[in-house]
A protein has these predicted regions:
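Short coil/turn segments at helix-helix junctions and helix-capping linkers
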Residues: 7-19, 53-66, 101-110, 154-159, ...
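Extreme N-terminal segments of fungal proteins
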Residues: 1-85
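HEAT/HEAT-like alpha-solenoid repeats
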Residues: 2-6, 36-55, 88-99, 125-148, ...
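Extended alpha-solenoid helical-repeat scaffolds
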Residues: 12, 18, 25-33, 77, ...
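Eukaryotic acidic, Ser/Thr-rich intrinsically disordered low-complexity regions
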Residues: 2-6, 173-249
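Eukaryote-skewed repeat-based solenoidal scaffolds used as protein-protein interaction platforms
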Residues: 60, 71-186
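Charged/polar, solvent-exposed surface patches and flexible loops
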Residues: 10, 25, 29, 52-56, ...
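Short, flexible/disordered secondary-structure transition segments
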Residues: 19, 37-38, 65, 106, ...
Length: 249
């Protein structure tokens, strides 16, 4: 299976825009042929190789409008897997692992398009959760485990803090866009953020997670913001006191 993905890997990272565009269209058709539960699945390694190529496909794209269009196209590739829960979870995981791995190599001139891609993928993830049903605890559990394991990991020192900050900054923005009726299981969605407040070793990350939980828009989902602010600050202060005590123990 890996050999079949090799042409896409080379063409998607080409400096020729027409070749990249053609390769992306061919890739969509290829992925559709492997999207059903009865088809031969792509391995985790195949998905990581594809995402590395897609990462550099965006890397090579210039002009902001074209970059945004491509980022949206990359997010829409997720829809190919809509009927296969196993692969769609693996697809999201490969995306986040790729972004985390390549983050340090993104220069300042290219950062904006990747920040936009991440925004697209946070939104797409929530859209997929909505399409599966907000009451689908099994799927939601697996999806938010991916977020908690990679971009919002509390303990993994290999995850860049910059990635954590950006996801926290846009988390409620994208939830608001997807769940206009405020029907989503908000506590399940906020669980990765709460885990950061309680378990992260980084003080700045903890504070930023607390700010996310104190977003006034969360009132629309029934979150008690006043209590949340106090509770978050108490947890942050307690965690920092424990760290200070440990330093002098």
């Amino acid at each position: 299976m890996a050999q079949q993905t090799n042409p896409f890997i080379k063409q998607l990272a080409s400096s020729d825009r027409k070749l990249r565009t053609s390769a992306l269209a061919s890739l969509r058709s290829y992925l559709q042929s492997h999207s059903t539960p009865s088809s031969t699945p792509l391995s985790s390694l195949d998905l990581l190789k594809l995402w590395k190529a897609l990462f550099y496909c965006l890397y090579m794209q210039d002009k902001p409008l074209h970059q945004q269009n491509l980022a949206n196209d990359l997010a829409d590739l997720t829809d190919v897997w809509s009927s296969n829960d196993e692969v769609v979870i693996a697809w999201f995981e490969a995306f986040w692992q790729t972004i985390a791995r390549e983050w340090s190599g993104i220069d300042g001139l290219r950062m904006d398009k990747y920040l936009y891609l991440i925004r697209c993928y946070i939104r797409k993830g929530l859209e997929v959760c909505e399409s599966k049903g907000w009451s689908n605890e099994e799927f939601l559990g697996r999806y938010f485990e991916v977020l908690q394991a990679v971009p919002l990991s509390a303990r993994d020192t290999k995850i860049p803090d910059g990635l954590r900050y950006h996801v926290l900054d846009i988390y409620v923005d994208e939830l608001e866009k997807v769940d206009g009726k405020h029907e989503a299981p908000i506590e399940r969605i906020l669980e990765p953020v709460r885990s950061l407040v309680k378990n992260t070793v980084g003080k700045v990350v903890r504070r930023r997670a607390g700010e996310c939980l104190a977003d006034e828009r969360l009132r629309e989902w029934g979150v008690e913001i006043v209590d949340a602010k106090k509770k978050t600050n108490d947890v942050v202060d307690e965690a920092e006191e424990e760290e200070d005590d440990a330093e002098f123990a």
